[in-house]
Amino acid sequence: MIVAPAEANNQAARTSAQTRRRVAVLGGNRIPFARSDGAYAEASNQDMFTAALDGLVDRFGLAGERLGVVVGGAVLKHSRDFNLTRESVLGSELSSYTPAFDIQQACGTGLQAAIAAADGIASGRYEVAAAGGVDTTSDPPIGFGDDLRRTLLRLRRAASHVERLKLVGKLPATLGVEIPANKEPRTGMSMGEHAAVTAKQMGI
């Protein structure tokens, strides 16, 4: 941690404000909203984000163009989606040289992506950038329960056939899946329930 006098911090803030460039939103694109398990039941986050990007490309004539960056993300991601935004860029008509990275902050993911892109433009790192978010409840990342996952990992590490057979014998007792729940892990309440509590406490 670096600590500086308040005067120095204020001076740095003034200097930063003077050198930061103005940022403008030039346009946008999205795919239509649809009910869960409806039109997009077989579509992945990557499918939908790529489609939204290609719509942006078509709308603004960006085919083959290299942008400064594409920032995006999703809340419910499969393990295969660890590089979701980059893979979506590679699947789009944008130049494959366009950098991209993921960001995640609950339902504010798309907004935080836009802020990150705008900050990059304001500081001079990029001339132009794209940002967005995507999520589907039709294709949630259903995972193994901890017991099954740990047993499978032990099976992979087993050094002998005898050890493997013992572990295989334990599998039926450890079967289980985990489906993402619409609730905060610490409170067990959904975002809507939290909003209701907040409104009640603040008299809204």
What does each of the following model-derived ranges do?
Residues 2-21, 35-43, 49-64, 82, ...:
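Acyl-thioester C-C bond-transforming condensing/cleaving domain
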Residues 26-27, 104:
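Residue-level detector of conserved, well-ordered beta-strand and adjacent loop positions
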Residues 70-74:
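Short glycine-rich or small-residue beta-strand-to-loop segments that form or flank ligand, phosphate
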Residues 76-77, 109:
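Glycine-/small-residue-rich active-site loops that bind phosphorylated ligands and cofactors
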